[in-house]
Regions:
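Alpha/beta-hydrolase active-site loop
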Residues: 1-20
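Alpha/beta-hydrolase fold nucleophile elbow
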Residues: 21-32
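Gly/Ala-rich beta-loop-alpha elbow adjacent to hydrolase catalytic centers
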Residues: 31-35, 39
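Hydrolase active-site cap/lid region
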Residues: 45-92
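Active-site nucleophile elbow and catalytic-triad environment of alpha/beta-hydrolase enzymes
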Residues: 90-108
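Short beta-strand/loop motif that positions the catalytic acidic residue
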Residues: 112, 118-120, 124
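Conserved alpha/beta-hydrolase "acid-adjacent" motif
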Residues: 125-131
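Catalytic histidine-centered segment of alpha/beta-hydrolase-like enzymes
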Residues: 150-161
Length: 172
């Protein structure tokens, strides 16, 4: 599994959804953390298929983390990738960091020019809010909301605030 194989999986989901006779022509794609990066990359590859994009604490740090040799709880030599990387209870294959090692994620996401909502917590200890700010600057049409005190994976109070932003964005 890698971010790029997850993009392929999401592309298959989009194709399937588009094939259903009862689905709308408009698609709102949403992802959180790594799923946010996957959704952003997928929207960039298929800008005509995605009407709106919602990213909650998107993990645009993944390529930088791979280059630095630390991802989640794992540490490794980025110049000599091991076959397996142990991230706590979740082992990752070499392909996980390898797929993003040379990626400029902010360049990769810019082909998507549709509307984007980014919601990120100011107290996120996993993905610094600066990544969300940089993404908002990279997109042509982005709305960024920073949730004061929000961590990576919002708590109940922060969920409520994030859902308010999502509901307003989806209603437009």
């Amino acid at each position: 599994m890698s971010v790029l194989t997850e993009v392929q999986d999401l592309e298959a989901v989009i194709r399937y959804a588009q094939s259903l006779p009862y689905t709308s022509d408009t698609l709102l794609l949403m992802g959180c953390s790594q799923g946010g990066m996957v959704s952003a990359l997928t929207a960039a590859k298929h800008p005509d298929a995605v009407d709106r994009l919602v990213l909650f604490y998107p993990a645009f740090c993944i390529p930088d983390d791979a280059r630095a040799g630390h991802m989640m709880m794992a540490h490794f030599d980025p110049q000599n990738l091991p076959e397996k990387i142990h991230c706590g209870p979740m082992p990752l294959g070499r392909c996980y960091p390898e797929a993003v090692m040379h990626m400029d994620v902010f360049r990769e996401i810019t082909p998507y020019t549709g509307r984007v909502l980014i919601v990120h917590g100011t107290a996120d200890g996993i993905v610094k809010p600066d990544y969300a700010k940089k993404a908002a600057e990279a997109y042509a049409n982005a709305e960024l909301h920073l949730i004061d005190g929000g961590a990576h994976g919002f708590n109940r109070r922060h969920d409520t605030e994030a859902i308010r932003y999502l509901t307003a964005f989806a209603a437009l």
